[in-house]
Design a protein with these regions (language model features):
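Beta/alpha (TIM)-barrel catalytic core signal, keyed to glycine-rich beta->alpha loops juxtaposed to Asp/Glu
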Residues: 1-152
Length: 154
């Protein structure tokens, strides 16, 4: 369509992608990658913070989930089944000597259809932690990927 109308062709897609939200990247857009070599810039790799593990004991007062206007996220943060799945990922993070956030970021970054990752941070320490996830990427083998997927599926 772009060529027909002498327009610039798209070169990337921006999709939500994390352990809980995989359908668009892994199924719906897989042909864009395979057929056209589109890139994919993903957002919400930490599932709005759920994959950090900080919601295991409820919604902390200093978190996004406690902010006015973010009430729509509270159901997700208090969903005990999802919180339990995140906690079941903790032994993998412990095995690698990393945080849950670093594990989730490394997992998302490792996917071959992911070109870049949009991260968010409200503290400098979170930015540093995000960068440290780069060292975890090589640890996400096919076996680890399968283990993580089985945990969040179950």
């Amino acid at each position: 369509i772009a060529e027909k109308h002498h327009l610039h062709k798209p070169v990337t897609e921006q999709s939500q992608y994390n352990l809980f939200e995989r359908k668009k990247v892994e199924r719906e857009y897989s042909r864009l990658w395979a057929d056209y070599r589109y890139g994919n810039t993903i957002w919400s790799p930490l599932a709005s913070g759920l994959l950090t593990g900080k919601y295991k004991d409820g919604i902390p007062d200093d978190s996004r989930g406690a902010l006015k206007g973010y009430e729509w996220l509270q159901d997700r943060f208090t969903n005990q089944a999802e919180v339990a799945k995140v906690e079941n990922l903790r032994p993998i993070a412990d095995r690698f000597g990393c945080t849950l956030a670093q594990l989730a970021l490394a997992w998302a970054t490792k996917h071959p259809m992911v070109s870049s990752v949009i991260t968010g941070a409200s503290r400098v320490s979170q930015v540093v932690q995000n960068f440290e996830a780069l060292g975890v990427i090589p640890l996400i083998t096919d076996e680890v990927d399968e283990e993580m997927r089985a945990i969040v599926k179950g």
